[in-house]
A protein has these predicted regions:
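Phosphate-handling catalytic cores of nucleic-acid transaction enzymes
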Residues: 1-226
């Protein structure tokens, strides 16, 4: 008969050295996600855990310098490399903790939509697949419409206002469009994308406007065959 085809066996990556420095629930989450993933991605699991716990702890804790728990993490891995599992795990953690209200939508339609979400829920986690396309559109000031550009602008402003108050924008008709004021906004975001899409989405403008400096970039150390 025809010889059987044996699928390639991909060994699980050994425990990275940085994982030994983690403790508490964060370490437990990263270890669990890495151990149960079909294609383990420890660095992406770290990003998922940091942002999920950051949203849960949002507006409750501050560091000695008043640093807050709002984080933007971008997980980068090849297509089919296991980036979806940490993304779903971050959302699952929020749901299993009974904090559905902390979980934002799978997509952000506009800058004003982001403001509305944080007005309703000041500590919130967005888990966004293929975030590279969103970042590319939000950074393209020559071609993208204003409501898309405002996504990145608002993300940058919310990040800086996490220890104070977001004062919003005054409009001419303040009865129809009242100013949105948000006390100590804690916006957390974990997105995943592929290397080509992410790096091609960046420009010198991202460095100049400070948006890139507010992101923790976690590029996979583990590649898996398709």
């Amino acid at each position: 008969g025809e010889p059987s085809i044996v699928p390639a066996i991909v060994s699980s990556p050994s425990e990275p050295n940085w994982l030994r420095g983690l403790g508490g629930p964060l370490r437990g989450f990263v270890e669990y996600v890495t151990a149960t993933a079909p294609s383990p991605q420890p660095l992406l699991a770290l990003g998922a855990g940091l942002t999920a716990f950051g949203a849960i702890a949002g507006r409750r804790y501050a560091g000695p310098t008043d640093l807050r728990t709002n984080l933007y993490c971008i997980g980068i891995a090849d297509s089919g490399g296991g980036k979806d599992y940490p993304l779903k795990s971050a959302a699952s953690l929020i749901v299993e903790a009974g904090m559905h209200h902390v979980l934002g939508g799978a997509k952000i339609a506009s800058g004003p939509a982001l403001i509305t979400s944080l007005k309703k829920q000041p500590n919130i986690l967005y888990t966004i697949d293929e975030i590279g396309f969103l970042l590319s559109a939000a950074a393209n000031r020559l071609r993208s419409p204003k409501y898309i550009l405002e996504i990145m602008d608002n993300m940058t402003e919310f990040y800086s206002m996490s220890d104070s108050k977001y004062l919003g924008t005054d409009y001419a008709d303040q009865e129809e469009r009242p100013r949105e004021v948000i006390e100590q906004p804690c916006l957390c975001m974990f997105g995943v994308t592929t290397p080509n899409v992410f790096w091609s989405s960046l420009s010198s403008g991202n460095v100049g406007d400070g948006s890139l400096a507010r992101m923790i970039i976690l590029e996979s150390e583990n590649n898996y065959p398709d």
